Amino acid sequence: MKRILNILFILLSMTLAIMIFFFSSDTGEESGSKSSRVTRLFLSLFVEDFKNLSEEEQELLIGEYSFFVRKIAHFSEYAALSFSIYGSFYTSNSPFRNNRRKMILIPWLMATLYAMTDEIHQIFVAGRGPSVVDVMIDSLGAFFGAIAFCVITIILLKVPGKREK
């Protein structure tokens, strides 16, 4: 079972990295359009009577919230990536598996390094460019993802009958 989980976490990590790469390959215009659609969806779900607003009022709200949606997406992508990398190490026979500091540090650093290379990649995409702020947000998300997996494992190990051998 542990081997299957390990393979699943590795595949999830690879899938997330590929997904992030493809999102970064979108031109500035394509990326902005996707962000606007996602923002519209969130606003229609969470803002009462959003659908009753005029198109102009809707676009104004979308413009106001789109920045935050983009930054939350950055945070979430890298939280998920770091979480899955942590899972890959946790379900393996890694020599530092029982060292919580290293188990947090290594996935966080791997995801942060990927965030840096992702920003370099955006230099070569029309209408996009690198952003130190995005790397910082990505890194914070990656740290959160690693901490989240660590906390979950601590909680699960305290559940009777779930202690590892």
What is each PLM-predicted segment?
Residues 1-83:
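"…centered on the first transmembrane helix and the immediately adjacent amphipathic helix/loop
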Residues 5-12, 102-106, 110, 133, ...:
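Alpha-helical transmembrane segments of integral membrane proteins
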Residues 15-20, 103-123:
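Small-polar-interrupted transmembrane alpha-helices in polytopic inner-membrane proteins
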Residues 37-42, 155-165:
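Membrane-proximal cytoplasmic C-terminal regulatory module of class A 7TM GPCRs
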Residues 56-60, 95-101:
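Helix-boundary and loop/linker segments of multi-pass membrane transporters
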Residues 78-93, 141-156:
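Membrane-interfacial alpha-helical segments at the cytosolic side of multi-pass membrane proteins
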Residues 93-99, 160-165:
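Membrane-interfacial, low-structure loops and terminal tails that flank and connect transmembrane helices
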Residues 115-139:
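Interfacial helix-loop-helix junctions of multi-pass membrane proteins
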